[in-house]
Amino acid sequence: MTKLEVCCYSVDCAQIAEKAGADRVELCCGQSEGGVTPSVGALMQARETVTIPVHPIVRPRGGDFCYSSNDFTIMKNDIARIRDLGFAGVVVGVLDTDGHIDMPRMREIMSVSGSLAVTFHRAFDMCQNPMIALKQLAELNVARILTSGQQQNAELGLALLKDLVAATKDQGPIIMAGAGVRLTNMQKFIDAGIRELHSSAGRTVPSTMRYRKAGVTMCADSDVDEFSHYCVDGEVVEAMKSLLVMGSPLAKHT
């Protein structure tokens, strides 16, 4: 059966995702930057309170995936901490200046990761040649690749996603579709034979604050609504999981 990974930007969201039936959580912070490394406190709380597999992202900043020596050292330190805390896996990716997989650095990351299941994240979608990148990641023995098929969303990238699935049919990383995967379009990914789906399955939640100071913001973008935040919608996760169960070959014959 196709698995559902839910992208969570807080431990609260991870707990909601688990309760709603998610198979796995990708734990991040910094939604506006596309996900960056969660704090040590968040990692510890997730480890203590979430029982399904949690894969924290290790990404020291937003933007591109070509990192300074300090950034890279920080990444290795974060991965070591995640490994030592006993997480099931980690989500990471590093490119070189020409848009290829940075193989020397990725080999170091794989070594530091130890028994962690490594997901190579959507840095894959920024690679020059996806099929060469796939071969390199297979050589590294990463567990899976999170990708939109090198498009702005995974539905637009279905053609490449199908090619990647075909190329890894017998061996290689699991291809996990992500970016714009929703209840309304997920059947397309199931029909394409994609084994894992990644979704934020969320909604905007208003702040509980009654007093709201006017004219002062913490964000550089003063148009951002700071009295709301994005959170996983448990009902959406439940509905997505139900569709996956009904869409599985076993369910169709029972």
Swiss-Prot record:
State the source organism's domain of life.
Bacteria
GO terms assigned for molecular function:
copper ion binding
Q: Name one GO cellular component term.
A: cytoplasm
Is-annotated flag, keyword Metal-binding?
Answer: no
> What keywords were assigned to this record?
Cytoplasm
**Which Gene3D superfamilies does UniProt cross-reference here?**
Copper homeostasis (CutC) domain (3.20.20.380)
Task: Give its localization.
Answer: Cytoplasm
Q: Does the keyword Transferase apply?
A: no
User: Which protein family is it in?
Assistant: Belongs to the CutC family.
Q: What is this protein called?
A: PF03932 family protein CutC
The organism named in the record is Yersinia pestis
Gene field: cutC
